[in-house]
């Protein structure tokens, strides 16, 4: 399965008639492996800050998680494994695997729990595959 197929079929999948607003799979270095057409253009320093938070959980809390110029308030995640952010009626989930970062961005009516499930399920699968 290609990386783009993972984004199209596993991340942008239909859930009760709704789907993520945007999704992507990036390398730890910020290289884009695959993304939805709606995924925001991000700055390299935004990915660097996200990677730092995985190494030093809580480092994003004071400044927020920035992605494509949008600021998300960091909410409880799983230190070193998952970062979650909230902005208004939407948010973002980032799951770190051995080699990749899996991103999901959502807006209502999708719920934070649905976004977490989609992103973390693919992330766990990639970890099981050694990726």
Swiss-Prot record:
Family annotation (CDD domains): PROF (cd00148)
An example of a GO molecular function for this protein is:
actin monomer binding
Write the record's keywords in alphabetical order, separated by commas: Actin-binding, Allergen, Cytoplasm, Cytoskeleton
UniProt-listed PROSITE patterns: PROFILIN
Superkingdom, taxonomy of origin? Eukaryota
- A Pfam family assignment: Profilin
One GO CC annotation: cell cortex
- What compartments host this protein? Cytoplasm, Cytoskeleton
Checking SUPFAM superfamilies in the record gives:
Profilin (actin-binding protein)
Entry function = Binds to actin and affects the structure of the cytoskeleton. At high concentrations, profilin prevents the polymerization of actin, whereas it enhances it at low concentrations. By binding to PIP2, it inhibits the formation of IP3 and DG.
**Oligomer status and interactors:** Occurs in many kinds of cells as a complex with monomeric actin in a 1:1 ratio.
What family classification does the UniProt entry report for this protein?
A: Belongs to the profilin family.
Protein name, UniProt field: Profilin-1
Whose protein is this, by species?
A: Malus domestica
């Amino acid at each position: 399965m290609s990386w783009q197929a993972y984004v199209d079929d596993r991340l942008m999948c239909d859930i009760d008639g709704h789907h993520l607003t945007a999704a992507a799979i990036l390398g730890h270095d910020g290289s884009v492996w695959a993304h939805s057409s709606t995924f925001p253009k991000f700055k390299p320093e935004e990915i660097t800050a996200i990677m730092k938070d995985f190494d030093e959980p809580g480092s994003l809390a004071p400044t927020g998680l920035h992605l494509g110029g949008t600021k998300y308030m960091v909410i409880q995640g799983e230190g070193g494994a998952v970062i979650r952010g909230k902005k208004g009626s939407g948010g973002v989930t980032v799951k770190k695997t051995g080699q990749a970062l899996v991103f999901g961005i959502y807006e209502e009516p999708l719920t934070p729990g649905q976004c977490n499930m989609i992103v973390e399920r693919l992330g766990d699968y990639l970890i099981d595959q050694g990726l």
